[in-house]
Amino acid sequence: MKTILDIRNLLRQYGSFIYTGDRIGDLIMMEDEIRELYKSQILDVKEYQSALLIIRNEIKLEEERKMNVKY
């Protein structure tokens, strides 16, 4: 896994379609779903760690974008 799209596609394979209209909210829900897949032993450690790293980096980028938006 290298991108958020890869993670979305992985979650779709297991019947999880996440879209709330709030990008950060979506990412947090994706993180929760990834954690559940790992706890269920569907994902191995490497996939789990990779997915969490990608999601957390994306959350950080999204928060920075929101702070840089000028009104």
Where are these regions (language model features)?
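Intrinsically disordered or highly flexible coil/loop and linker segments, enriched in small
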Residues: F17-T20, L43, L61-R65
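N-terminal acidic leader/helix
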Residues: M1-I24
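Short, structured secondary-structure boundary patches
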Residues: L11, S40-V45, M67-K70
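Short, charge-rich amphipathic interface segments used for partner binding and complex assembly
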Residues: M29-L61
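Charged low-complexity stretches with an acidic bias
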Residues: M1-I7, I55-Y71
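A short, compositionally biased N-terminal segment around positions ~18-40 that is enriched
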Residues: Y19-K39, N68-K70
